[in-house]
Amino acid sequence: MYIKKICLFGCTADPFTPAHMAMVEAACKIHDIVVIIPTIVDYYRAGKTKWLSDDQKLEVINAFVNKSKFWHKIIVDDHEFQLRTRLSFEQLANRRFYHTLNDMISKYSENGMNEICMMIGSDSYINFGTWYAYDKILNILGDNRLYVVTGRNGMTNELLPTYKFLNENGKLQDYHINTFKIDDRFKDMSATKIRAKYSDYKTYLDDVLD
């Protein structure tokens, strides 16, 4: 039986940017399926204000995906948005990506027959040790199944930290990551900067949604 390599990519998507899409397309080249998971937990945890509604986020993401030559390898999963209809505010506030990862593995692993990987940017990886249950995330994924996008803000492989995880024998060891770069045009692009320069992004967004 063929084992599919499925890469999970969680992001707040507020907004989803060309840099996000460049990451997704790079992951498509080495995975069978890439699952984009727009998340909601950051807003509850950090007290942030949403810029785009859930529906707007999905519209933007799907517009990017529909224009991609890898559209057939990409799934947009609104799992976290659907949680709003089932969970209370307090329950949502206690959600972390660890919980979503478990949900996604149950949904896509096909009882362990598929290989589940995860992709994050180097800026997120730098702070990965502060994530809720980060060590359990590494344990669940297994060694060498975390993909980190480098090159942003001068970040190189040598500057990335090393985290520990429990291997299959229950011994603590260094976790090995995979790294790759995206086009230099997108290396300094971030949702935060785009929100600060809304008018410039809106022109690009109008072209995407056209």
Predicted features and spans:
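Nucleotidyltransferase catalytic core that binds NTPs
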Residues: M1-D210
